[in-house]
Each structure stands twice: as C-alpha cells, then as structure tokens.
C-alpha cells in the first residue's frame, strides 16, 4: 500500500467511519479501556501483529488497563490512508 496524505474531506469521513478516533495535532488518536492490565496487554500484542503486517507502527501508551494509540505517518508528516487502514484494523481487534 502506497501511503498518501488524507485531505480534509477524507479526514472528516475517517472520524465518522472509524468510531472512537479523534484528530489531534496531525495524528489520529483513540483511548481504549479494559478491565485489567492483562486484557490491555493482550490487546497490545494483537495490535502489534497487525502493525508488523503493515510495517506501520503506532505511538502508544499503556497505564494499567488503559491503552492510548496515536497514528500518523512520520515520513509524510501527517495522517495517511495507511493510518486509516490501521485504525480500522485496531477497532476490529478491540470489538472482538
């Protein structure tokens, strides 16, 4: 997949199509909450496997049962179709 920067209209569609994600400072971000650390870490492990598949890696934080994921494409300096795809895949994992 060749990444390209999403335009304003595409970004507006992204936050509607992919629930829970917000646009903040040239990145998309979502907070995920779990019952405990084990569930949070299991989620992160599943996400890591998808990230490797796309060779695209998030900035993320984990504090006990909370995971915050931030996506952007550093090489292009903004939010791309690759970030959109990864956000959608991450939501699928969370919804399982």
Swiss-Prot record:
Source superkingdom: Bacteria
Keyword DNA-binding: no
One GO molecular-function entry: 4-alpha-hydroxytetrahydrobiopterin dehydratase activity
EC number from the UniProt entry: 4.2.1.96
BP GO annotations: tetrahydrobiopterin biosynthetic process
Pfam family of the protein (one): Pterin_4a
SUPFAM superfamilies, alphabetized: PCD-like
Keyword Ribosomal protein included in the entry's annotation: no
Family, similarity comment: Belongs to the pterin-4-alpha-carbinolamine dehydratase family.
HAMAP family registered for this protein in UniProt: Pterin_4_alpha
The protein's name in its UniProt record: Putative pterin-4-alpha-carbinolamine dehydratase
């Amino acid at each position: 997949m060749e990444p390209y920067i999403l335009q304003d209209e595409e970004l507006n569609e992204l936050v509607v199509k992919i629930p829970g994600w917000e646009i903040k400072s040239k990145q998309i971000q979502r907070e995920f909450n779990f019952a405990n650390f084990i569930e949070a870490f299991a989620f992160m492990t599943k996400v890591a496997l998808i990230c490797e598949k796309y060779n695209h890696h998030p900035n993320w934080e984990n504090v006990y049962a909370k995971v915050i994921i931030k996506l952007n494409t550093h090489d292009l300096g903004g939010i791309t179709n690759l970030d959109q795809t990864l956000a959608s895949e991450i939501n699928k994992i969370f919804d399982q």
